[in-house]
């Protein structure tokens, strides 16, 4: 192994890399006409890697400007399955007037890098680039092939990003058996049952399914002044009300059970699935409790209503869109409950269908995560958890790839990490970036 040291360490480069990445406005509105695209940012990423000797492939995924970059570093044992390290270049839009700094400034101040994407997820993109550059410059050969993928459109479901790549360019991921990406690896500080604090590092091993459902009610059109007993708006409103107010039962998956058991061991709290106050106990975890609480049960949140075109015309139809988040292995039960709630006079159709995902919390890759974290934070304990949202892991899982959320960040206990996702004044601590870069480097050397 080459030990030349006349080039920067990953931790020397990561802050400037993340700041530079944020300065690319890669806002994704969800509409091609108004989305800026990732092309300029993707080409910049490619230049950072090609500068040190990587061969990168730039791919536009289904639409002009939706840029992706993929490269591979050969490992010592080519017979082993490759490891994919992936991150998305797009970000959600930001309204500059709401921020204390410009959201695309990449400002470095008060110990933080500020801007849209600092947490979601240009922090990891910067860490990936920094470590990849170091491995190439040093001539380090990892134990297995590493595939680095920087992709588009995650914030809108990946149709013009990972979804397209998996469908049209699966060759880019040939031989990949495992993957790491968002959202996991961050620390959660909890009060220890014997006093003091304990840092848990949450490794994502599961995601709820994301299915957007359109409800349609049909009735008899007519004049608004008449008595009317077949009003589509009234029928739809009743169905939406029943669905939106319904609390689905608690179902603890393996991942959530393991998470609650680990937290209980450290804090002394009891997380009983049959307790009527389970939600209240989970809320004691602080800000992360919002994420964990959302993984205890299925959910169906009405988000859009459409009906009518004039105040005095009773429309012949009315529609609603419902954001459904479904636990792994629970789709059939969820659909049966929905059908009962909406009733026979409302039809449903799925307009987006990204299935749930869950893997086990074991194996050599999990051991490597644990070892890398313990080497930098001897007080670390890793625990599995489920993400209530969705990531590109849903697409990669279709290729048979075992996916984890692992972006190592040691966070200040007082930082409301969950609120920074898509939030105003999104920022990442500089110390968290340097910590994460060191952990990621160690992990990739022993993966």
Regions found by a protein language model. Give the residues of each.
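Short pre-catalytic strand/loop immediately N-terminal to key active-site residues, enriched for Gly-Thr
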Residues: 109-120, 380-383, 424
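Short beta-strand segments
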Residues: 86-87, 150, 180-182, 216-218, ...
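Solvent-exposed loop/turn segments at secondary-structure junctions
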Residues: 29, 91-92, 153-156, 185-187, ...
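Acidic/His- and Gly-rich active-site-bordering loop/insert found
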Residues: 2-116, 135-144, 322
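Metal-dependent amide/peptide-bond hydrolase catalytic core
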Residues: 1-4, 9, 185-206, 210-441, ...
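Beta-strand segments within the central parallel beta-sheet cores of soluble alpha/beta enzyme folds
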Residues: 59, 143-151, 178-180, 230, ...
């Amino acid at each position: 192994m080459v030990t030349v040291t006349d080039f920067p360490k990953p931790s020397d480069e990561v802050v400037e890399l993340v700041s530079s990445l944020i300065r690319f406005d890669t806002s994704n509105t969800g509409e091609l006409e108004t989305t800026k695209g990732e092309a300029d940012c993707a080409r910049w990423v490619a230049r950072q890697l090609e500068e040190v000797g990587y061969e990168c492939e730039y791919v536009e995924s289904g639409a002009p400007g939706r840029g992706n970059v993929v490269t591979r570093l050969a490992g010592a044992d080519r017979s082993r399955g490759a490891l994919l390290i992936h991150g998305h270049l797009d970000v959600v839009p930001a309204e500059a007037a709401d921020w204390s700094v410009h959201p695309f400034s990449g400002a470095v101040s008060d110990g933080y890098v500020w801007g849209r994407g600092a947490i979601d997820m240009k922090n990891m993109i910067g860490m990936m680039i920094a470590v990849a550059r170091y491995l190439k410059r040093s001539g380090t050969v990892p134990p297995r092939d590493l595939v680095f993928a920087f992709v588009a459109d995650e914030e809108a479901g990946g149709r013009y990003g990972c979804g397209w790549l998996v469908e049209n360019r699966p060759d880019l991921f040939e031989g990949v058996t495992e993957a790491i990406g968002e959202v996991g690896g961050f620390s959660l500080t909890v009060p220890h049952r014997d006093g003091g604090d304990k840092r848990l590092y949450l490794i994502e091993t599961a995601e709820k399914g994301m299915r957007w459902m359109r409800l349609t009610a049909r009735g008899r059109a007519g004049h608004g002044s008449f008595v009317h007993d077949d009003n589509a708006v009234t029928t739809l409103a009743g169905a939406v009300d029943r669905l939106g107010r319904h609390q689905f039962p608690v179902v603890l998956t393996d991942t959530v059970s393991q998470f609650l058991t680990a937290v209980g061991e450290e804090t002394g709290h009891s997380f009983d699935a049959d307790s009527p106050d389970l939600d209240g106990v989970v809320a004691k975890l602080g800000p992360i409790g919002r994420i964990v609480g959302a993984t205890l049960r299925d959910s169906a949140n009405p988000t859009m209503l459409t009906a009518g075109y004039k105040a005095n015309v009773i429309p012949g139809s009315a529609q609603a869109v419902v954001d459904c988040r479904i636990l792994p292995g629970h789709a059939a039960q969820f659909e049966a409950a929905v059908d009962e709630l909406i009733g026979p006079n409302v039809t449903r159709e799925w307009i987006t269908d990204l299935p749930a995902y869950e893997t086990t919390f074991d194996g050599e890759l999990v051991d490597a995560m644990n070892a890398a974290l313990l080497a930098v934070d001897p007080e670390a304990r890793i625990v599995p958890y489920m993400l209530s949202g969705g990531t590109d892991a849903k697409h990669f899982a279709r290729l048979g790839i075992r996916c984890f959320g692992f972006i190592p960040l040691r966070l200040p206990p007082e930082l409301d990490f969950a609120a920074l996702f898509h939030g105003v004044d999104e920022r990442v601590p500089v110390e968290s970036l340097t910590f994460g870069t060191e952990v990621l480097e160690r992990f990739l050397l022993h993966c």
